[in-house]
Regions:
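Sec-dependent signal peptide cleavage junction
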Residues: 22-36
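Carbohydrate-active catalytic/glycan-binding domains of CAZyme proteins
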Residues: 33-347
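Composition- and surface-driven signal marking solvent-exposed, interaction-prone regions
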Residues: 1-5, 25, 247, 303, ...
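Lectin-like carbohydrate-binding module/patch detector with strong preference for beta-trefoil
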Residues: 341-488
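Hydrophobic core
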Residues: 14, 18-22
Length: 488
């Protein structure tokens, strides 16, 4: 009896141990699979409460296992509302923490403009220091830097004031902590030149001017990072809200000789402007993530309607970089692996068709559901009348079906003329309801009709709500290019 009892006990123990091992393996494998997160490019990100993330022109600081994202949170008129802070462990799921600086933090912030906020940590003073560009909210002539500090990364920051560094005007700027020595990089002389300053040991002030780069070349939106002993400085041109060719330079010492400027990305940096470059250090590699803003001002929108563009940088050599487009970015903060890709059309999903020129969504006029209702562009409002499914029509063509009405995009009366109205209609089996998706590069597409060989166009290159959708001969215009944003 004792032997049988002992045998049963041993069998029971073996089952428990094997069960625990299986559970352990299951948990580990699921944890590994869940590590990589997918981010869609060119959209407005949302936090864990479903609110739009307002962190434009900002930067990220990693503290412990969390990434803290600081950025601009503006009023509808573009003036300063707050510097908002979000945190995430995976760069996908963002929790709003607080508005670390607000318009009530100091008198000169009540009516002001605050741009490009960046936070660095001073290990000697145990302070988190926030630098930003300050203007008076009335004109754009003050051109000062401003500073605030806090003893906690996502707590309330105490405003220290604004000033011109060593008397120089300062607009677009960033700060960089080089292993305890910090630098301010800012556009000066009305953006004509780029100055690099060394900060004081407490990071609250400017100690000295290190050097002036690219005199008269009008560079802005600086972002500095260091890779394998080489410093990279990324900038954009100065063309207002409109995107332009991103460029970079390198040096082996911040205070030494910098290279000439070289291009990266395409001619518009994929319709974005640099804000920050984030090193993502993992168990197998370190990836450098370009973080850019797709400013809504380019389509006459409000600043807080702007989108985000994140892409991994590649390094052909120790002193060169490149950046390729991908509509989706896979982020694995555990391994440090970041990849960009552009998946094929998902015929089970719905998409928002966003016009490149107007920044607005293709919509059925008045959210109509009837045959013959015209199509227009309208700011993305979350309506089903702005969501479309691609249904294969064979031979590389698609029917594009509206989510609200179940009807297809077609050309009015099957007309072959330039200017013919684009409408919705029940599926009639006509080739005027068939569309080819033509790659326009950098995540932009043309929608070409099978019957007419013409492109869906927004009439007159309008950027306004209600701009009419028509067909027109392909002329390469941005108003004929569309972004396919998957509804998540």
């Amino acid at each position: 009896v004792m032997k049988k009892t002992m045998l049963r006990s041993l069998c029971y123990l073996l089952v428990v141990v094997l069960g625990l091992q299986l559970v352990s393996v299951w948990l580990f494998s699921n944890e590994t699979e869940a590590a990589a997160e997918n981010v869609q490019n060119g959209i407005q990100f949302k936090d864990t409460s479903g609110n739009i993330i307002h962190a434009h022109g900002g930067g990220i600081l990693k503290v412990g296992s969390y990434y803290y994202w600081f950025g601009e949170n503006r009023n509808a008129d573009g003036t300063f509302n707050a510097v908002s802070c979000y945190r995430s462990s995976d760069l996908k799921t963002w929790e709003f923490r607080s508005n670390v600086l607000t318009k009530s933090s100091a008198a000169e912030l009540n009516v002001s403009n605050i741009e490009r906020p960046k936070v660095i940590y001073n290990s000697s003073t145990n302070k988190f220091v926030l630098w930003m560009h300050w203007e008076n909210g009335v004109d754009y002539g003050q051109a000062r830097t401003a500073v605030a500090s806090s003893s906690t990364v996502d707590g309330t920051y105490t405003y220290q004031g604004s000033f011109r560094p060593l008397g120089y005007d300062s607009r677009d700027m960033t700060v960089f902590n080089d292993n305890g020595t910090a630098y301010l990089i800012s556009a000066t002389r009305v953006n004509a030149d780029m100055n690099i300053y060394k900060l004081t040991p407490d990071f609250l002030g400017v100690d000295s001017l290190v050097q002036t780069l690219w005199v008269g070349q009008y560079r802005e939106a600086p972002a500095m990072f260091k890779r394998n002993g080489v410093y990279f400085l990324v900038t954009s041109g100065a063309t207002g809200w409109d995107p332009n060719q991103g460029k970079y330079a390198t040096a082996t010492s911040i205070t030494g000789t910098w290279s000439g400027l070289s291009n990266f990305g395409d001619a518009t940096t994929y319709d974005s402007q640099s804000a920050y470059v984030l090193p993502i250090e993992g168990s197998s590699s370190t990836t450098y993530l370009y973080m850019g803003d797709r400013w809504a001002g380019a389509w006459s929108g409000k600043v807080m309607e702007s989108r985000y563009v994140w892409l991994p940088l590649s390094f052909p050599s120790s002193t060169s970089l490149s950046m390729s487009w991908g509509s989706n970015v896979s982020l694995d903060t555990s391994t440090g692996t970041v990849t960009a890709s552009s998946p094929a059309i998902d015929t089970n999903a719905y998409y928002i068709l966003e016009n490149r020129n107007g920044g607005k969504a293709l919509n059925v006029l008045n959210q109509g559901t009837a045959d013959g209702d015209d199509l227009e562009q309208y700011i993305d409002s979350g309506w089903y009348s702005q969501q479309w499914k691609f249904v294969s029509a064979g031979s590389g063509y698609y029917k594009i079906m509206n989510r609200a009405s179940g009807k297809l995009i077609g050309v009015e009366s099957g007309s072959t003329a330039d200017g013919a109205i684009i409408e919705q209609w029940a599926d009639g089996g006509w080739t005027s309801q068939h569309w080819q998706i033509v790659d326009g590069g950098a995540g932009n597409f043309k929608l070409k009709n099978r019957a007419t060989s013409k492109i869906i166009d927004i009439s007159g290159a309008s950027k306004a709500n209600g701009g009419a959708a028509i067909q027109w001969t392909d002329n390469g215009g941005k108003n004929q290019q569309w972004r396919l944003l998957k509804v998540e």
